[in-house]
């Protein structure tokens, strides 16, 4: 299976409501490799915009081909707009480089950012206010973009960018181990009580098989704990106080910690070896030695299957476990593009038009052209990104199912 790393990638996370989606990466490209900004408005109303995060031919030949196709299609439909691509892989600069770029003001007209980057971008004064340019005419799917994704590019009522991808976490489970343990592989647990029951049954299979896995090294333990807190309607930080205060020492949080303690020390459903860092659980899961753990869908298509050689047919996803069976939220993350404050009005309009074509229209561009993804050998059908609600999300799901190359029914519990 080909990796979709360039298409869907992320690093920082933010807490969102359960209705919010998932964030992933899309990019832009054309002929130029200059990192400087494009021209404002030339003769005859022509405009050039520079866009970073374009996939280089050397590292990502298929993604590069798709990008070039999209640029050609877009420029043919908009002959007054030229896309000047800046090729970089990976497109997310290390924090020090990103900070240096902002301080120097050397960003492209449209530049790649994570959902968590806006405060730093605004502090550096390197974002154009695009509020007056974005509406349901310039971005027809605008009203269906999940609120949390759009909020990542807002400060008060002002909009400084557009999201292009997102993600959220869920329960990844081994359907084969569920069957072997006498459990229903189409009915993953939704409460911590059910997790305990199912994990214990799986652990009883023996042969080094663990029912539940979790991280506790490399900051990953706190990352998962934050997601568990969100799922029960809590938060790690109370932002209503001045200054904000820690808010994770609650009865609900204590119940979650007690559940993990019971899984580890009473049920013996977790590995006796802890201090696990990211990457360990994926390897264990791919080897058929782990029943369940939480992650985003990209763990499957970027790590478990292509890297650790897991069997795609054995994998299912469900929602994050909660105390009630209905998660109130989840850690989510994503990315999109901000606009340079040096952009002219014509460049802002052209940039919005490009993002609408490339990343915000079902069936179009780099993110949602599932027909082309299938033809180019990429896996199609994973429930990511989930950038929309309403009619737009229904259209995305219809196209995703139409061109699916994976068993999409195994992710129904997660999507619903």
For the regions a language model picked out, list residue spans one by one.
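Hinge/lid segment of periplasmic solute-binding proteins
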Residues: 115-170, 224, 228-231, 314-318
């Amino acid at each position: 299976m080909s990796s979709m790393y360039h298409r869907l990638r992320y690093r920082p996370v933010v807490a969102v409501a359960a209705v919010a989606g998932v964030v992933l990466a899309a990019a832009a490209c054309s002929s130029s490799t200059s990192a400087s900004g494009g021209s404002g408005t030339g003769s005859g109303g022509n405009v050039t915009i520079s866009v970073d995060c374009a996939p280089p031919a050397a590292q990502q030949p298929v993604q590069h081909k798709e990008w070039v196709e999209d640029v050609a299609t877009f420029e043919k439909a908009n002959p007054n707009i030229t896309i000047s691509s800046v090729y970089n892989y990976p497109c997310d600069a290390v924090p020090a480089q990103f900070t240096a770029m902002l301080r120097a003001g050397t960003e492209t007209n449209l530049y790649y950012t994570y959902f968590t980057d806006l405060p730093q971008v605004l502090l550096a004064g390197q974002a154009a206010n695009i509020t007056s340019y974005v509406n349901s005419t310039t971005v027809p799917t605008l009203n269906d973009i999940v609120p949390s994704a759009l909020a990542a590019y807002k400060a008060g009522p002002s909009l400084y960018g557009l999201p292009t991808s997102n993600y959220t976490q869920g329960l990844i489970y081994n359907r084969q181990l569920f069957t072997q343990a006498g459990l229903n592989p189409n009915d993953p647990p939704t409460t911590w009580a059910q997790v305990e029951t199912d994990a214990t049954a799986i652990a009883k299979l023996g042969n080094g098989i663990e029912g539940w896995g979790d991280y506790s090294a490399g900051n990953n333990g706190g990352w998962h704990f934050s997601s568990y807190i969100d799922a029960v309607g809590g938060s790690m930080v109370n932002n209503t106080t001045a200054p904000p205060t820690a808010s994770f020492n609650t009865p609900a949080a204590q119940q979650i910690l007690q559940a993990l303690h019971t899984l580890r020390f009473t049920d013996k459903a977790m590995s006796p070896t802890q201090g696990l860092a990211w990457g360990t659980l994926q390897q264990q899961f791919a080897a058929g030695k782990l029943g369940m753990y939480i992650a985003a869908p990209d763990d499957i298509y970027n790590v478990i299957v292509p890297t650790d050689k897991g069997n795609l047919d054995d994998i299912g996803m469900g929602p994050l476990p909660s105390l009630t069976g209905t998660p109130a939220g989840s850690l989510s993350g994503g990315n999109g593009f901000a606009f340079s404050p040096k952009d002219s009005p014509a460049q802002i309009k052209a940039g919005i038009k490009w993002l609408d074509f490339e990343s915000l229209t079902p069936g179009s561009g780099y993110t949602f052209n599932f027909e082309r993804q299938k033809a180019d050998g990429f896996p199609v059908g994973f429930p990511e990104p989930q950038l929309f609600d309403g009619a737009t999300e229904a259209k995305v799901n219809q196209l995703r199912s139409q061109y699916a190359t994976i068993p999409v029914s195994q992710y129904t519990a997660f999507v619903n």
